[in-house]
Every structure is written in C-alpha cells, then in structure tokens.
Amino acid sequence: MKLPYSWLKELIPDLPPVADLEPTFAHLGLPLEGVEDVPAPVGGVLLVAVKAAEPMEGTQLTKLTLDTGENGEKTIASGAPNAVGLPAGTMVALVTPGTTLGGITYGVRPMQGVESWGMAASAKELGIGESNAGILTFPAGTAAPGTPLRELWPADSVLDVEVTPNRADVLSALGLARDLAAYLNLELKEPQIPAAPTQPGEIRVSLPDRGRVLDRDPQGKLRFGCDHFAARAVSGLQNGPAPLWMQRRVSLAGMRSIDLIVDTSNYVMLELGQPTALYDRRDVAGDGLVVAFGLREGETVKDLLGNTHQVGPEDLLILDAGMSDEPVMTVAEAFASAGQPKEGSHVLGIAGIMGGDHGHVRADTRDVVIESAHFDPVLLRRTSTRLGLKTDAVYRYERGVDPLLAPKAAVRVAELLRAAGGTPEAGQTVVGTPEVPQTITTTGEQIRALLGMHIGTAEMRESLTRLGCTVTGDGDSLTVTPPSWRVDMVIWQDLAEEVARLHGFTELPETLPTLRVHESNIGASAQSEARAELRRTLAGLGFQEVVTYTFTSDEEAQKARAEAPGVRLRNPMTTDRTGMRTALYPSLLRAAGAHPKGERALLFEIGRIFPAAGEQERLGLLMRGDLAARTYQDGVRGDFSVFKGLVQGFAGAVGASFALEQLRGDDVPAALHPGVAGAVVWNGERVGWLGALHPEIAQEFGLKGDTFLMEAALPLPGRDWAFRDPSRAPAAWRDLAVIAPQGVSYGDIVGVLKGAGGELLESVEPFDVFTGEQVGAGNRSVAVRLTYRGAKTLTDEEVDPVFNAQIDAVKARGWAIREK
C-alpha cells in the first residue's frame, strides 16, 4: 500500500522524519518495501485559468485562451482529448516557454495558425502522477493565475508498506496512523467528521435475509450477504476536476485522478479504509437500493468498463428499487415483479466489487446516491475470484472492513461533496445490524507465559488502550473489547501479539520453548513419524522425493489413462490445472519427463488424490534408466526384477512382508503393460499395484526405454509383532521342483507352499527355473529351497510330514512334482 508521508504527518503532527521510520514499521510487523522521493514540479510550471476553449477547424487541436497572471493573456494549441469544451475558469498546469521538462525545452511556436505559448501538460508529463489521458485540470479558483504549481504540490516521500492479509485495519491513512501513534505513543489527530444524521434519508434500502443457506456453502462459512448499509443523496453537483489537494493525495497513493465524484469516493477509501460507491440518481429508479443475491443462473451483468459477466444465485448485486415496493431476496423475484424488464437495465453494480454500466456517474451527473456498506468478505472473495475482478475495494473487503464504519464514511463523502458545491440531504438511511466485537477475557500471567516477557499487567492495559481497546478488570485479570476496526483480534493470543508488538518484538528473550504434548496429537505425531520413516528409507535406497501439484486436467488424465478429474476447480489458475488428480502416477510421469534425457530417474511422492471414492493418501514410486552410470562398460540396467527388488528392500527395511500377485485381464491397471503387472501385497493386504508402464503411455509422455511404477494406498498396513527368542537349533532343508503352467506366477506357488508349511516353515527361496521337453510344452519348472526350523533340532520324522503336506497341496492344484 502506498501513502504519502505528508498525509501521515497531518494525522500525527509529531511524526519523526521518514529516515527514522523504517525500524518503526519493521517493529510493527509492517515493513517498508520502499520509499520513493517525489520531487515538486519544476519552477516553470504555472497554474493558469482557461478563458476560452475553441476547436481549430480542420484539425484535432483545441485553441485554449489562458489567463497566465503577470504574463497576461496567452494562447496554446492542445491535442489533449479533455481540452475540448473546457469550461471557462478551469485551471490547467502550463509549461511556460524556456522550461525544460523531460529533456525537452519548451518555447513559443506556431501550430496551425495559433502561436502556442508553451504546453498544457498531463500528470505523467509533469512527473507527479501516472495519468497521461489528458491535461491536468483543477477547479476554478484553485489559485491566482500564474501561481507556480510547486507551491501547492510540494515534494513528498511515498511510503510503500507491506501489509499482511490479517491487517486490513491499516489499509488506510487513518488506520496506519493509528498504529504508528499507538507504537510511538504520539497524539493522533483524526479527520473532523460530523456525526451521522439520525433521521432516515430519501433513499430506501432493502437487504437480503441473514443466515441464508447457499448450495456452495454447506459448512456455513458465509455469515451474511450485507449486514450494514448507509445511503445518502447529494444534489446540485458540478462534476469536474477534484480539488488540487485531493488529486495530489490520490495520485501519490498510486491511483488515477478521474473527476470530483470518483476521486471523492477513492479518497475516502484511502483515508478511512471504507470503500464507497456513488450512483447517478437519475438511474436509481424508485429512490431505493436493493441488495440481492444474484440473477437466475446464466444471466449477465455489464460492468462500468463495458465487460460482461455471467452471474448466478450466489453473487451479491446492487439494484435500484424501481421494480418493486417490497423487499426481495433475489433479483429473479425482482425481475418477475417488474414484468421482466430489459436485461441488466436495473442492475447498478456487483456489490463491493465494481459498479455497473447502468448507474455510473458521468460528466453531466448533478445528483448522486452514496452507497457505503459492509459485505460478507468470503462471499465477495468468491465472486471476485470467479469473475476475475480484483479491485481496490474488494482487496479491502475480503480482508475485513470495519463493520461499523459505513455510516461515518457516507457522511465523509457527503461533506467533501458539500465543500465542492453539493447539497447533502438532511437525513441518511442506515439499515442492518452489524456484528460487534466480542469481549476477550485473559490474564496478564497467561500473556506473560506465552510471550516469555516480563511485562506488567498495567502496562498491558495501557498498550491495549492505545490501540483503541476497551480494557477492564481488577488485579491481573483483563477483559478486553477490541475496536470495531480490529477484526483480526478474536482470541486472547491476538491480544498477546499486540502487547508484544507495542512492547517490541526485539525485547523477546531468547529462551527454549516449553513443549507440551496433548494426547489428541499423539496419533498425528505417529502418522507424521511413519511418513518421515518412509521418506528416510526410500532416500536411503536412492529415490528422490518430488512434490507436485494436486491439480491436473482432462487431457493429462486421458494421456495417462487415469480416471478423469471428478472434483473441478471453479477458477483454475491455468488451463492445464482444471481439476483434482485421481491418481499419483501421472504426476510422477510428468516429473520424469522433465529429467534430462538419458538420465536415470528414481522418484517417489507421498501425496493426496481425489477419486470418486473420496480423498486418499498415496505412495508412488517410479524407476527408469540405468541404475549405475555407463562409462567404459555397461551400467546396471533397470528392469522389472531390479525394481521389484528395490520394493522388496524397502519392505524389508521397514520390517514388512512383501509379495506380488500377478494380475491378468481386466484386473491390470490401464497404466501398466498387460504382461508385467502385479498387485502389491503388504503384510498380507493388497494395497496397490506395481509393473511396467504401458508403452503407449510412455510415448505420450516422451519417455524412452522402460519405465516402472508402483502406487499404493497409505498408511501401509503394519504387522502385529510378537517377540520370539531366536532359535538356537539348526535349520532343516528340502528342495522341491514344481511343474506348473507358465501362466502360474511364482507368487501363487509360494502361497500354496506357505499355506501348507505350518509353523515349522521358515522361508521359501527360488534357485532354478527350467523350461523344456522334460516338463512339457507350456509348462515350466520352478525349483525352491524350503527351510524349516523349530525350538530344537528337527528330525526327519518331524519334517517329512510337513514336506509331504506341501507336495499334496501342490498336486491338489493340478501341478506336478519334478522327479529329475
């Protein structure tokens, strides 16, 4: 946020110089992003009065006859669009002959038959603003003709303050001055604003019911549509340039000066932090304003810039009351009561965001209706984000505007317009019941314990009072009611932060915190530690962790043959991030594709997916390329057996059992090669799948060579551990060769042998695979070593029954035992 130092100095007369303020802002938690020194206009720029503005026939120029004071009457030719029809008396900034500006020295020169004496300049040309849409103009009587502009527009310093999202109260000159005055313990001189009239005005206002349930708000985060609204009419205005002092402040704050009415609205927002809107009263039918939840789905509203927006039942709009004398809930109801008027003709604006094409002020506006309101910040944020409308007003609303400020801001606008020649009506309509700050109860000891600072309770009371809080309580107790503008002060920890801020964060002692473990956090800590263990183990095996977006698109899901996104984003950041992913492996494929070609990739990710069944946490692994660098000899090529071995090593490292069950037919995930796919069995439970990436998908993602994937649900099932003394007895072995069809997986064979092996069977290890005429066409022989161990040395009489039971189990499956 940008503000001129002179504005803050007016509010805090004893404010230190700019050079001394940088540490102060840092201590307040509002660091300065920069300080820009803005020089005064050069000495040869004078304020002069327009006597006549005449179009020059056959040209795009306007002849201006000027009263320059001591230099008498002069003429210039101007091509500025706003020079046409300038009223007599209007003052402009004239660059006089002999003055150098922007490297150009101006003089007297003939232009289309007119002797042009210098140039009427824009704010940008003078270096005092960003607008170059036309010449800089001021109201008649701003100064005596011939007055140097620098006398009324002195040099200044513009402070660029970094404001955190929770500190909406400092998004104004008054709010920032309050904080500075409280910290520096200096006197604050607030703007003199009369009390709001107690009698209602001529403008009627209708608000929507509170507590309305919206389809897209099942958790009730939206508290209200509009809970406070002030409206007042001002008549007899002569719209034109704003006063010089107002233009100066608006320009230095980074906004473009438009005209008296618009600048006044912007000025009050910059001064008090309350956005306002002003409508041409000619367009406010029925002298009433209706705040209503949006049009029927799919209807459109045109904003004051001419852009069309599609709005729906959950967007808050401002309408005139010409359609009905009764309060309405929705615009659709209002349309129905009016017999379907022309689309958009009665919509005055999108509440709190931007005015509409109908009702905005124009050059010939004489009478206005002031709107000053408090809207639901969540509702406005959603609407502005969806419509892509980010304005200075919604920037403040979505962070939290003072809910009680609306009537005061309306009075301020009315009084500034009165000073410019307007006549505010005697009354002011105020409707709604805004939320008031809730009382917070704490103790000095509680705050001291949190901060670790020895601050007396009396000092805490004094600090909070300086911030505008109402503080009561005896002894060590503190009962605090925050000011209405501090919507961020809700719990006692917020009070502790404010005490520390005013006392000085630099005074915080360097002490180790006292950590308290609550029983409700034990489960969460265990889950976090389990994830950390997974990460450490996988990193030890050579995998690198990647963290990718949970967003994806239909196109990417289709490329990866994954389920299309079911959860859609209303306002996607980009076209390739339109929904929530339903699988983890497409993200890993994208990350692998970003690796330099030819390099190996051992990647893992622990992340969330959002399929139709609901949100899940997953572990994904990917391997491609060589496992060892290729130099003068071949490297270690990453194949399926290597990848499976890495997963087995991972399981062993975390004390889990791992098995792979072959998948066939429709059970094979679409991402995998039909012949190299298996189900991951972890501690006896199926948790996911593992296999080779389908070649067509690899081609889609630009991955050459073999790529292997695993995806499993988290948390991985644990084992029920029971301690057993290691046996001191030796093991007994038997070798067995099983002849089975080649379609039978090794995992199936092991499962049969383990199922019949009982407690004596310790392990099953393969040592030979054979195919040939001896075992029959379409078959293969898998030879395994069976290891048995008991509490004592096993005899043949104890081992043979178990071994024979395993042989019987094999034969029962229709398989054979190879004798030779």
From Swiss-Prot:
Domain tRNA-binding span(s) in chain numbering: 39-150
GO annotation, biological process: phenylalanyl-tRNA aminoacylation
The keyword ATP-binding is annotated on this UniProt entry: yes
Domain FDX-ACB residue range list: 727-818
PROSITE patterns, per database record: B5 (PS51483), FDX_ACB (PS51447), TRBD (PS50886)
Cofactor(s) the protein requires to work: Mg(2+)
Matching Pfam families: B3_4 (PF03483), B5 (PF03484), FDX-ACB (PF03147), tRNA_synthFbeta (PF17759)
Cofactor stoichiometry and binding remark: Binds 2 magnesium ions per tetramer.
UniProt-annotated location(s): Cytoplasm
Assembly notes: Tetramer of two alpha and two beta subunits.
Protein name stated in the entry: Phenylalanine--tRNA ligase beta subunit
UniProt gene name: pheT
